[in-house]
Design a protein with these regions (language model features):
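Non-catalytic, mostly N-terminal accessory regions of nucleic-acid modification and defense proteins
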Residues: 1-168, 230-233
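Conserved S-adenosyl-L-methionine
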Residues: 146-235
Length: 235
């Protein structure tokens, strides 16, 4: 039986996934939909988590939402290009070579409206990372998306991490990181099996700068991994 927190996360993931039907008329594939959703969710989640300082002024969620439907799509397309060249390093990497697959202004307006209507209070409380990872899992389980090769099921990841028993003294590297699941699980294991509040300054510095490394050459997947890692506190 699921916990209330899991039910909340699953409900939000289901609502987000169902929005892919909005894009069918635009000929958008499943993996293109998740990419599109990543752009929009990044802006919305930055607002909800009070981290909009990493985004340049004038290119944030409220700026997108405030545009009238006819001009919103044009603004959004220009914003993707702008964000790929401005803002924090993470912002620039996530939006590198970003472009929209949306063709109709009304389609974008529906997505913005529906995303804004989600239960963001409980999403913040239960964790943005689990929400986004649930969306990635949904995409991986959809055979038509072809994304399964980049997403390893969490039970398998957790089992492998439990066998390896990583510690803060280790260096964790995933040379084919996919959407970042192994790195996230290793980080969770380390923190749950130690007392981060008692780490020395040297240990904290090592944790932040010299513990987790990942490589992913497919840009689409690399983009998703960066978003996933950021929402789990690894950036």
């Amino acid at each position: 039986m699921n916990t209330p927190a899991q039910n909340i996360t699953q409900d939000i993931v289901a609502r987000l996934w169902n929005l892919c039907n909005v894009l069918k008329d635009d000929g958008v594939t499943y993996h293109q939909y998740v990419t599109e959703l990543t752009y929009l969710l990044f802006l919305k989640m930055a607002k909800e988590t009070n981290t909009e300082a990493q985004l340049p002024d004038g290119y944030r969620w409220d700026d997108l939402e405030s545009k009238s439907a006819p001009e919103r799509l044009d603004f959004y397309r220009k914003a993707l290009i702008h964000l790929g060249n401005n803002g924090s390093l993470l912002v620039r990497e996530i939006f590198t070579n970003a472009s929209s697959f949306i063709k109709k202004p009304n389609t974008l307006s529906i997505l913005v409206t529906e995303i804004d209507k989600l239960d963001w209070y409980n999403a913040r409380r239960e964790g943005m990372g689990d929400l986004y990872e649930g969306l990635l899992e949904k995409n991986a389980n959809e055979k038509k998306s072809g994304a399964g090769q980049y997403f390893t099921p969490r039970p398998l990841i957790d089992s492998m991490v439990a066998v390896m028993q990583p510690t803060l003294e280790d260096i964790i590297q995933d040379p084919a990181a996919g959407t970042g699941g192994f790195l996230i699980a290793a980080n969770r294991y380390i923190r749950e099996n130690s007392t981060p509040d008692t780490w020395t300054e040297t240990q904290q510095r090592k944790y932040r700068r010299n513990t987790f490394y990942g490589m992913e050459f497919v840009q689409y997947t690399h983009r998703l991994a960066l978003m996933n890692l950021m929402l789990h506190g690894l950036d």
